[in-house]
């Protein structure tokens, strides 16, 4: 019945809902928390979603005090995940469409009057609901400790997005008596409560994980919020985390510096989120990351965690968290200081390896992704180092790695041709594609390069130069392996063979497109014959019948 009503109201506008009579619709009762109320919750939320269509509709919904309060309570307190998600999204959408014009320190917003913001943060009853529902020290009827931690997780999931919309509303205090009751410092608001007081991180390691993820989301969501100060490479979110010691505390979990004595159990649960936090920090604020002591500390940690035996690389659990962090670092931080062995990249193997290690190499060698135009343009600190410096560093790392590991391309093509190990084969092909499509600068850089091998300026020419040429081009031109003629038909081997053949075909197509540009710009350098050969292979499609071993048996029906 409720689903039918939701379908019937599907095409309605908020104006039509109002004409039907908001007084006659039991929003407050229909938004009550309870297991038996879930269908009615969904119906009431579906009707209220009509108010997200325009600032005027949202402003009208903001005038319904008891309804807004009921939505906030339902979002934080319901035991139904679907209803909680729907209610949380409704609150975000109402706040977004009602956001006033852009203010200092805030992201670009809409043209609303801010009435929903004033209702949520300015009304005492609504504002206190955040604290009462999420604080472990307060007692709310029907809410156990587990229910409170769920409410905490829901608040931490949404708060970074609200901070990106209106930093001042989230960070500043609104009702001093409410905030003081929960030990919030003078001037602090909901952000201080969530980041500093709400979670008992020393006793609840799972909520500590959620808290670290919250810090990562906050740092990333607020990257465009300039501090309007002389501090370079900064944002309001990052500045907040540093000022309150949260940045150093979280980083220390991963770095495990001498004398820190981390709890082994806590480290086991928190190491991954802390590594992801640093990966977000390094990739979102590369200039800020490079300006401090963090590059050396992170590299020292990576040198320790990535120093594994060949057997562990190939057969044990991959150090995924460390590899993700290494792939997220500015490539300038991965350049060797002196000998090549001082770079963490030198520890990544190509022979006895795993897909995660090869994906990391592919990401590092490729260089920065090609930027798209965005508005407004990001603050200065969020594009530093620029793509030219990053591309030059990626090129230098690739050639240093190749000079010190001349078997690299032999290993890569061997892995790429091993259909039985699908993930390893696909990651090896990604290494080939990443170099072909590498975003390296064509201008001369002052970064030292090895003198024992050729160092072309572009990735596609690097593939066509020794020692890569001996292995990569024959592999790309060779027909793919297929198992269509074996007993069993199109089972898993066929699927793996097709996926690998398609990835290989895409790599060859990328090489073809770049060689076409090369021949047009610089004809007569001998690439025309290679281009013609590649064109013939591409004309055969991803699955060439020449790759089949043995003959297909034809059955003649007599």
Question: Positions of the model-derived regions?
Answer:
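Extended alpha-helical scaffold regions
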Residues: 1-558
């Amino acid at each position: 019945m409720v689903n039918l009503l939701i379908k019937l109201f599907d095409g309605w506008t908020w104006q039509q809902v109002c004409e039907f009579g908001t007084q006659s619709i039991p929003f407050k009762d229909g938004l009550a928390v309870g297991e038996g109320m879930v269908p009615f919750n969904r119906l009431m939320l579906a009707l209220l979603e009509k108010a997200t269509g325009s600032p005027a509709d949202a402003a009208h919904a903001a005038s319904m005090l008891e309804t807004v309060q009921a939505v906030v309570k339902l979002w934080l307190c319901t035991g139904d995940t679907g209803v909680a998600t729907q209610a949380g999204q409704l609150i975000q959408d109402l706040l977004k469409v009602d956001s006033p014009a852009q203010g200092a320190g805030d992201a670009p917003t809409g043209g609303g009057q801010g009435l929903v913001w004033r209702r949520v943060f300015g009304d005492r009853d609504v504002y206190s609901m955040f604290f009462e529902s999420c604080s472990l020290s307060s007692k709310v009827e029907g809410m156990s400790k587990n229910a409170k931690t769920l409410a905490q997780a829901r608040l931490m999931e949404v708060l970074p997005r609200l901070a990106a919309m209106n930093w001042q509303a989230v960070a500043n205090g609104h009702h001093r008596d409410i905030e003081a009751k929960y030990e919030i410092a003078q001037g602090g608001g909901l952000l201080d409560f969530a980041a500093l007081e709400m979670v008992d991180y020393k006793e609840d390691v799972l909520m500590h994980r959620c808290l670290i993820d919250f810090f990562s989301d906050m740092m990333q969501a607020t990257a465009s919020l300039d501090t309007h100060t002389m501090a370079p490479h900064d944002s309001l979110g990052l500045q907040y985390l540093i000022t309150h010691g949260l940045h150093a505390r979280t980083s220390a979990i991963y770095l495990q510096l001498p004398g820190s004595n981390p709890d082994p159990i806590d480290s086991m649960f928190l190491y991954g989120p802390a590594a992801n936090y640093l990966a977000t920090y390094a990739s979102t604020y590369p200039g800020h990351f490079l300006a401090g002591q963090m590059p050396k500390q992170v590299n020292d940690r990576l040198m320790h965690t990535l120093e594994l035996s060949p057997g562990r690389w190939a057969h044990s659990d991959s150090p995924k968290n460390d590899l993700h962090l290494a792939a997220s670092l500015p490539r300038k931080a991965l350049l060797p200081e002196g000998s090549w062995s001082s770079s963490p990249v030198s520890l990544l193997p190509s022979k006895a390896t795993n897909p995660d290690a090869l994906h990391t190499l592919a990401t590092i060698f490729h260089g920065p992704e090609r930027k798209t135009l965005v508005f407004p343009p990001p603050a200065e600190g969020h594009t530093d180092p620029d793509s030219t410096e990053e591309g030059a560093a990626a090129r230098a790392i690739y050639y240093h790695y190749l000079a010190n590991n001349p078997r690299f391309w032999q290993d890569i093509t061997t892995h790429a041709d091993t259909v039985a190990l699908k993930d390893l084969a696909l990651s090896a092909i990604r290494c080939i594609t990443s170099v072909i499509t590498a975003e390296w600068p064509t201008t001369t850089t002052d970064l030292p390069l090895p003198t024992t091998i050729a160092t072309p300026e572009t990735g596609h020419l690097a593939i066509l130069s020794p020692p890569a040429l001996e292995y990569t081009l024959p592999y790309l031109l060779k027909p793919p392996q297929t198992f269509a003629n074996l007993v069993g038909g199109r089972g898993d081997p066929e699927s793996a063979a097709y996926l690998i053949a398609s990835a290989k075909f895409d790599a060859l197509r990328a090489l073809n497109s770049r060689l076409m540009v090369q021949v047009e710009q610089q004809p007569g350098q001998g690439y025309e014959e290679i281009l013609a050969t590649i064109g013939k292979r591409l004309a055969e499609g991803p699955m060439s019948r020449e790759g089949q071993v043995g003959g297909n048996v034809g059955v003649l029906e007599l």
